[in-house]
Design a protein with these regions (language model features):
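Sequence-specific dsDNA recognition surfaces
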Residues: 30-42, 57-89
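Non-catalytic DNA-recognition/assembly elements of restriction-modification systems
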Residues: 14-39, 166, 219-220
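A short glycine-rich beta-alpha junction/loop motif
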Residues: 9, 13, 40, 113-119, ...
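Short, solvent-exposed loop/turn positions at domain surfaces
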Residues: 3, 40, 78-79, 109, ...
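Short, ligand-facing micro-motifs at secondary-structure edges
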Residues: 59-71, 90-116, 132-136, 145-149
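Amphipathic alpha-helical segments
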Residues: 6-11, 17-27, 134, 168-207
Length: 220
């Protein structure tokens, strides 16, 4: 989109809510969060205690909350302070077998503190942003391309804190962040509802088929 008065290329999206104007600013991720690698506790500490965020929690949830974290670990003095994850923090996949998957991100949306593992990098919030906007932003094709080029490795690909901190993205005001995120959340909710309906209909079809053909089950 161009400004006809000055022939200046404006840094604005092609599709936008009408109440917003002005350019999106380019920021490195380090302006919004500080990065840290996760903890590597002994195996005997697993299975009890504080919830422990792993790569699977990043990949398998729309967002991460305390109750859907799979693993637990017994923490020792200083672990919560050093490796604690709080509401709005972003979690990144540090290592992957494929370059395309390295640096995938999710957001923690819970008031209960958790900790995170060694194959995860935490982006600790240090500036005001709308957490779910960053969840969607970091999954966008543009962001993924910028993150992937920071990955390195041969058989196994990794991304580091320094690489993530230098990823630069176009960021709107927090008011526009919230508006965009709520639209995407609404769409995700509709998708989840439709998927439940599809699952029920498929179950109904299986039940009808079983009832229709049960009497022929012993025939050859």
């Amino acid at each position: 989109m161009t400004d006809n008065n000055e022939n200046k290329v404006l840094n604005v999206p092609h599709l936008r809510f009408p109440e917003f104007s002005g350019e999106w600013e380019i920021y490195p991720l380090t302006d919004f969060m500080s990065f840290k690698n996760g903890m590597n506790p002994d195996a005997k500490r697993f299975g009890r205690g504080t919830k422990f965020i792993s790569v699977m929690d990043i990949l398998n949830n729309q967002f991460i909350c305390y109750d859907n974290i799979r693993a637990s670990v017994e923490v020792v003095d200083g672990d919560i302070e050093t490796y604690g994850v709080n509401y709005g923090d972003i979690l990144f996949q540090r290592s992957s077998e494929t370059l395309e998957d390295v640096g995938q991100a999710n957001v923690y949306l819970d008031s209960k503190p958790a900790v995170f593992g060694g194959f995860v990098i935490r982006g600790k919030s240090k500036s005001n942003y709308y957490p779910m906007f960053f969840r969607y932003l970091l999954a966008s094709p543009t962001a993924r391309k910028k993150i992937i080029v920071k990955g390195a490795g041969a058989q196994h690909f990794n991304i580091g804190q320094d690489g993530l901190s230098k990823v630069c993205l176009n960021i709107p005001s927090i008011q526009e962040q919230e508006k965009i995120a709520k639209l995407f959340e609404c769409i995700d909710t509709r998708i989840a509802t439709q998927n439940k309906i599809i699952d029920k209909l498929q179950s109904l079809i299986r039940g009808i088929n079983d009832s229709l053909y049960a009497q022929y089950g012993n025939e050859v």
